[in-house]
């Protein structure tokens, strides 16, 4: 259920991880949604001004990211599936939840689906966990690491008052957006988004994803028991909701301090010069 997310922006390319959640629509088509970290696709975001009723309105748009799934047979890689996806919801890493919900544009891309841990009980500290992600942009391939649940939501409330959990699973460039799972039943308990050193990585817990989904009325993107809306309803959903300027100003100081403590977003990216040079095709991968 793990995939690579490839984001090709104007001045940079990036790669991270994601997880597929599959539903059937009213016509019986397999619809593949992908959860990833907001900062994995933030280079695809752009704004434009439009006139609505004589007033200026800022319209937020996203270029399609690419979803890459490796196909394996008898322990060998035999090919890759690549498909464009549209961005349905986005919450940025600085002022929001650092979450993004994508939808693969083609029906029946894959049949696999993640199962979210939606129980009210939070797994105990010391619980064995697994992380699956795309190491250094493996382009669809997955690497697995293990660790434990090392702390519940007291960590990093300083970043926009958001709750993170902590884990010792090994993370790497490309881990951002990848799932963290219970080792005993493989249920998804959170999304890896930040790191501050070896064995000290931060997870957006699934309970916070649930809070986000309830607020934006998209619990159908987590819970298969909830009916999916029709296409017209989905197409009218706003991609993002931004905090007020006042709130952003109040949070600036706390965010600056938190960045010093937890500096690493676990995304792989290629950065291009501000003035493109045809003789330079790619620059080396760097951590963002």
Q: At which residue positions do the language-model features occur?
A:
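Active-site region of chymotrypsin-like
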Residues: 1-7, 14-16, 105-115, 141-222, ...
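C-terminal subregion of chymotrypsin/trypsin-like serine protease catalytic domains
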Residues: 181-285
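Short, surface-exposed secondary-structure boundary micro-motifs
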Residues: 37-39, 134, 194
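Glycine-biased strand-turn-strand hairpin within the trypsin-fold
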Residues: 1-35, 40-55, 226-243, 264-276, ...
